[in-house]
Amino acid sequence: MLNGRLPLLRLGICRNMLSRPRLAKLPSIRFRSLVTPSSSQLIPLSRLCLRSPAVGKSLILQSFRCNSSKTVPETSLPSASPISKGSARSAHAKEQSKTDDYKDIIRLFMLAKRDWKLLLTAILLLTISCSIGMSIPKVIGIVLDTLKTSSGSDFFDLKIPIFSLPLYEFLSFFTVALLIGCAANFGRFILLRILSERVVARLRANVIKKTLHQDAEFFDNHKVGDLISRLGSDAYVVSRSMTQKVSDGVKALICGVVGVGMMCSLSPQLSILLLFFTPPVLFSASVFGKQIRNTSKDLQEATGQLTRVAEEQLSGIKTVQSFVAEGNELSRYNVAIRDIFQVGKTAAFTNAKFFTTTSLLGDLSFLTVLAYGSYLVLQSQLSIGDLTAFMLYTEYTGNAVFGLSTFYSEIMQGAGAASRLFELTDRKPSISPTVGHKYKPDRGVIEFKDVSFSYPTRPSVQIFKNLNFKIAPGSSVCIVGPSGRGKSTIALLLLRYYNPTTGTITIDNQDISKLNCKSLRRHIGIVQQEPVLMSGTIRDNITYGLTYTPTKEEIRSVAKQCFCHNFITKFPNTYDTVIGPHGTLLSGGQKQRIAIARALIKKPTILILDEATSALDVESEGAINYTFGQLMKSKSMTIVSIAHRLSTIRRSENVIVLGHDGSVVEMGKFKELYANPTSALSQLLNEKAAPGPSDQQLQIEKVIEKEDLNESKEHDDQKKDDNDDNDNNHDNDSNNQSPETKDNNSDDIEKSVEHLLKDAAKEANPIKITPQP
């Protein structure tokens, strides 16, 4: 049966799955000569496991049956693409990543360009303090040589040969120099800290500025928790790199240069010997620096994920508690913590290997210099003082090199965090809020011409296709339709959060795709179903976004118009009452009325009401509808309402009905459409009306009621049986049911209910809206 070919084995997958592209990337699998003693013998291969990164799980070859005693020839699955191409791409990616690292570092330091005077002053003070500090080994060497040549002399009679000064005067001058070095060190620390704080503040301001001017597509793809993490933890890492480590790095660089110069002047032979240890140090810094940078970026991303989870849990804490899901959310948070722990552990091992390598090289160099320096002293080629000074310079220079390695490590971490911040600043929004012509408001004529639209995050799901309608100036129009058919999307398109895929949207005969977004939005007021208030006072929220400062009378007038003046005046601080984050100290209806006042005080040309009265009680809704009715009569603005409730639809003059495909199926006066029982509006409102119980629901209730009566009767019989010990056996046989009988009855009840539900589903008809001529 084999006939020179290996048949399809039992791989635990279907034959048609092998044709999928992701399975086509399996590595080449060869089966060597498998000899079977008989044609029907079953060869178990249950232990043979093939693992492919393309699939992500093992494919178990369970068994196959051979019908021939012939040797099975070599057979292989299609091999993957050539390795050379992948290697080339990998090498190119590594080179590109390395280039990006250096670009991020350069960009980070370019932020300090405008403070170059401050930077130069700090470097000058740092040079002074480092130079004085690096003179200590030389001074120690001079003092030791002086003491050796003047053994037995009085201390005050000792003179330094180089300067011809008494030793005590020399030490006094050196003490003054050390004090100057300390003052310079204090000054450089303050200046560099101020400089770094300015750089980080500038970076944060730039990031938040770019973020606030991004388009809606950006916020669809980025969660709030991740953005908060970038502004918080990532900026902190950059701040630490720019404050502590930059200062230490510059100090280490100066100390290293001065130390190498002093060592070369003391003993060129020992200096040449130390050069052999330089390449290994540079090599380790190059190898481990890249790893540290990558782990730092991974750590920041894991921290961002943790922040996202915490932000989602805390913002929805009432939902979590109402569903008693604290345990599930705790598990989610623990998973994010474990991810951070794993990345942190990897970073710890990488840093440990790097610092251990540099420390080992430093210790080896120190011992080598000590051994060879001792030989030079014995050969009278080097004095004891110079050897001591050289050894101290070796230690100082080693610490400087170690400081540079730490500086490089921290800079790589800062580059990893900075790259995430630069991703935000470098992104150009598809809809710039500051580009375009200034909107010239007229009367608020709105027209959609052959508009088709899909959200950028879901391009395959079309919301509109060739949508056409026109809204007259000063009119009141309500947009209704089935849920999820794009009613709120129309509001987003009018505010130009998105551009239509095809077609044009005009306001006052001006194509909004060519208008400045800020200029357009200043003339459009919007009240959403779930209003968002800012932390601050009630006055701040009513006047939010205004380009001028309104008078107290204007604020009070619009508050009365929206029927929120009464409850505001009941607060101790009235309009200056702080309402907390997102208005948490107010009720839902109070927040909604303040949001309406916020929209009306700007006197917009177009007012968009997206379920604006959904959070109000009947009395408040009636009052607000009265206000909107007065606005409609004044014809001062075009009002576009999005609603499901009849009370909201009724107040509008005209109605636009959207169908299931997102197209307009009906337009007209509300009274005319509502009076016509065959109109799309009537059909939609009748479907949304709360119907009485169906026949199936009544039957289900009867079945459940019957079961409850049976259970009650069983309970009474059981109680009677327990009280009557003499007739116990007889009652058990006649009244009590066996467990099997009870289970059968429960199954019958469940099947009856399930059958009735199926019948109800069959009889249920979806909403069908037919276009009216």
From Swiss-Prot:
Record domain ABC transmembrane type-1: where: 119-413
Protein family according to the UniProt entry: Belongs to the ABC transporter superfamily. ABCB family. Mitochondrial peptide exporter (TC 3.A.1.212) subfamily.
GO molecular function: ABC-type oligopeptide transporter activity; ATP binding; ATP hydrolysis activity; peptide transmembrane transporter activity
Start and end residues of each ABC transporter domain: 493-733
Biased composition (Basic and acidic residues): 706-733, 740-762
Protein keywords: ATP-binding, Membrane, Mitochondrion, Mitochondrion inner membrane, Nucleotide-binding, Transit peptide, Transmembrane, Transmembrane helix, Transport
Transit peptide: 1-90
Topology in the lipid bilayer: Multi-pass membrane protein
Subcellular location(s) per record: Mitochondrion inner membrane
List of residues binding ATP: G481, P482, S483, G484, R485, G486, K487, S488
Protein's recorded name: ATP-dependent permease MDL2, mitochondrial
Biased composition (Polar residues): 73-84
GO cellular component: mitochondrial inner membrane; mitochondrion
Pfam families: ABC_membrane, ABC_tran
PROSITE patterns per the UniProt record, alphabetical: ABC_TM1F, ABC_TRANSPORTER_1, ABC_TRANSPORTER_2
Gene name as annotated: MDL2
Disordered, as annotated region: 73-95, 706-773
Classification via InterPro entries: AAA+_ATPase, ABC1_TM_dom, ABC1_TM_sf, ABC_Tap-like, ABC_transporter-like_ATP-bd, ABC_transporter-like_CS, P-loop_NTPase, Type_1_exporter
Keyword Transit peptide part of the UniProt annotation: yes
